């Protein structure tokens, strides 16, 4: 977990073993051929995990992502974009494969 002050986790959230929450990444818009990537500055963005989310084992949540209420992130997924509520998202990068009706 990086920059924990940028991470918001709702109620009844399951974050399973080996999950990484990354609030920073290298800003590759500054990259130049022949220079080390490590010379690129870090950019930071928050992660917001809403109520009732399940994040499967070994998943990676990238900076700037919001995971909607009741969503399920499949094991080993890399979440690079916002995930809507009440769905299942899997893969690298994570894509929605199923949606659920909110019964409330």
Feature-to-residue mapping (PLM):
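Flexible, glycine/small-residue-enriched loop-and-beta-strand segment within the central core
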Residues: 1-66, 92-93, 100-101
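C-terminal/domain-terminus segments
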Residues: 65-90
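C-terminal end-helix/capping segment
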Residues: 83, 87-104
């Amino acid at each position: 977990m990086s920059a924990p002050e940028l991470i918001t986790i709702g109620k009844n959230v399951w974050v399973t073993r080996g999950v990484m929450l990354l609030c920073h990444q290298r800003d590759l818009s500054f990259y130049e051929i022949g220079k080390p990537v490590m010379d690129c500055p870090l950019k930071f963005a928050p992660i917001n995990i809403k109520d009732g989310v399940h994040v499967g084992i070994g998943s990676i949540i990238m900076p700037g992502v919001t995971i909607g209420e009741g969503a399920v992130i499949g094991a080993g997924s890399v979440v690079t974009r916002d995930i809507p509520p009440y769905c299942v998202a899997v893969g690298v990068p994570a894509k929605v494969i199923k949606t659920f009706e909110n019964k409330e």
